[in-house]
Regions:
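RNA pseudouridine synthases
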Residues: 1-151
Length: 151
């Protein structure tokens, strides 16, 4: 029906225009030096290889990328990070964490440490919370799952 398709279009627009709040958990190969932090980089997407990379601000086509993280659990070799995206770039979390020296466990594309040993894990990255304004009532709505990663 027309009403529900309009609502769906509004939700889609919020996600595409970065108006929706998106949160993730990731298990990293390595532990960040700081328990809380912000990663700010410039990313360039390569459509031919379906990858992105960190580049200098002056690189043609580079786009600003920013995320905030907090360590929620860790052991000697891994950490569980709670991540909030301020921007939503192609493979942003994967690229920025790898560039920071703490790639995601199971990331065959950006975790070059793991490429040598292949853990057999899938990509340990999970969207756990999304928030947006209800298209009709404009009330803030949030949907969340529990942290799926235990270390």
């Amino acid at each position: 029906d027309v009403c529900s398709s309009d609502l769906a279009a509004d939700l889609s627009r919020q996600v595409q225009t970065k108006m929706a709040d998106k949160f993730y958990y990731a298990v990293t190969d390595g532990v960040p030096e700081q328990k809380k932090g912000t990663l700010e980089d410039y990313l360039l997407r390569d459509g031919k290889t379906n990858t992105s990379k960190v580049v200098s601000k002056s690189t043609e086509g580079a786009k600003a990328a920013r995320l905030n993280y907090e360590v929620t659990a860790q052991n000697k070799t891994n950490a569980v990070l709670r991540i909030r995206l301020d921007t939503g770039r192609h493979h942003q979390i994967r690229v920025q964490l790898a560039n920071a020296g703490i790639p995601i466990v199971g990331d065959a594309k950006y975790n070059f440490k793991e490429a040598m040993t292949r853990s057999g894990n899938g990509l340990l990255l999970c969207s756990y919370k999304i928030g947006f304004k209800h298209p009709k009532t404009h009330k803030k709505m949030e949907f969340e799952i529990r942290n799926p990663f235990l270390i």
